[in-house]
Structures are given as structure tokens and as C-alpha cells.
Amino acid sequence: MNAAVKRDADTADATPRQAPGPSMLERAFAVIRALSEAQPDGGRVTRIAKAVGLTQGTVHRILHALIAEGVVEQDENSKLYRLSVDFFALAAQAGNPSGMRTLCRPALLRLCASLGDTVFLLVKSGFDAVCLDICEGPFTIRSFTGDVGGRVALGVGQGSLAILAFLPEAEREEIIRFNVPRVRGYGVLDEVYLRTEIERVRQLGYAGRNSGVLDGMAGVAVPVLDRTGVAVAALSVGTLAARLGDDRLPMVVELLRRQAEAIGPQINPFDIALRRPVGGMARVMSTDGVN
């Protein structure tokens, strides 16, 4: 090797390698997430670009690639971009892992009719709980997960706490370590509080009622356990605090338990869709409310 080549090689070796940027697939999903959080009538390229940290030109190219695939559409008049009906059809098909939503839907309908309150079905997804289904009652409430598909860190809200408390110990500890910085964002939650609540839920068999995060709201949830006693979902009631006093709470818990116990034996214990590891689920969400 001559001296000039050697100097070039030494210089190349000494130069720190830059970390690769996000792939086109990652950028596309970032744009899809931004669209999902946009106003109902859609979003503009400028706002989407700001939300995802990409140039307007890059976002424009991604949007038109997504339009070509049929998952995004652009309004001819407003020129706003939004997720298409085809996208939601795909999401609906994928949003029923192991037939869990189909299995639990009758229970949600019965509970909503019996209680007159909003009932949620939550399932675990990595470090989060995801709202898989809702049966809405007559009272206007706010929830941690919002609508179907909404996410919240495991440990925040009654439904996600009911799931977290009945996970295997090693998995539970990993989730607690990862989520403690996230739950602190709610002001009243820290690791001591979280661990105390988990132990309380394990002793009582349910999570409730007023988290203290939102005045005037309350909730209660029970885990849906598989045949090994591990939580795969939670049934949760969200309502006004005045409707979940000491006199009514035992009845609500009992109705939730009956439905959860009826669902549990029907769950396939070998279904890998319900045993996904937590690794890699590091996206932080910010929501507020009950359930």
C-alpha cells in the first residue's frame, strides 16, 4: 500500500461513522401515525413534516407513495391528506388478534346493558395496553386510551394496571423499569405508587376506582386470565365518580369478574399472538383520563 492510500485508509478509519438514518419504511409509518393524530378532516404536508421531523419534499413523496397503495387519500377541495377507508379496513382485520375482540364483544354488550356505563376491552401490546373494543354508555367520559386503537403505558389507568399486575414476574419487572419514566408524566405516579397499586390489585383481584388523575371520573377493571393465570386482556368500566361509590362497586366488580371468568377458558393457551415479547416497543404515548 503506498503512503497516500495508507493515509486515506487511516483517515477513513479515524472518522466516526454516522448512525444510519431512519429507513423509508420507518418514515412512512411515522407519516401514517401523524395522519392518525391529525384532525378528522386531515392534515397538511407542512404540519405532518413538522410532526415527524422530515422535509416537506420527503413527506410529499411518502404521501403520494401511500396514495398509490390505497392507504392514504387527498381531498380534492381542501387538499388535506387523511387515512383512507381501505386503511381502516386493514386495521379492522388486524385489530382482532386471536379473535379476542369477537370473543369478548358479547361480554361488553352485556356489561354495558346491565351497568349503563362505558365498557372497554384492553389487551397488552409490548409496554402498552391497547383499546381493542368499546361499548359506550350514556355518560360522557374521558379515557386514557381514547377510542379503539388508543394506547397507554401499562400501569396507567385501571385496565392497563389490571393487566400488568397479573403478568409473569420477570415480564412485569421489565415493564415497570421501562414505564416508570413514562408514568411520572401523570404527576401523581411514581415507582413506589405503581408497585403499591400492583400489589393491591393482586390482592383484591381488580383495579379501581379513582386514579386521582382526572377529577370527577372513576373506573374499575378486572383481568382476563388464561388457564395459567396470566393476564391477556382486561375488562374495564369507565364512568362518573358519583356512579362508582362504595355501595355500587362490589356489584360492578362481580359482574366484570363473571364475564372475565367466562372468557378465560375459551382462550387458546398456545396462541403466540397473545405472547408477544415486550422488546422493541419503545414509543411513548401521552394521553389522559380513565380506563
Segments from the language model and where they lie:
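Amphipathic alpha-helical effector-binding/dimerization core
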Residues: S78-F178
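Signal-transducing coiled-coil/dimerization helices and immediately adjacent hinge/linker segments
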Residues: I272-N291
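Short amphipathic alpha-helical signal-transduction/dimerization elements
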Residues: S36, S160, L164, P168, ...
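Amphipathic alpha-helical regulatory segments at dimerization interfaces
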Residues: A34, A51, T102-S114, F120, ...
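Short, solvent-exposed recognition segments
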Residues: N2-T11, T140-D215
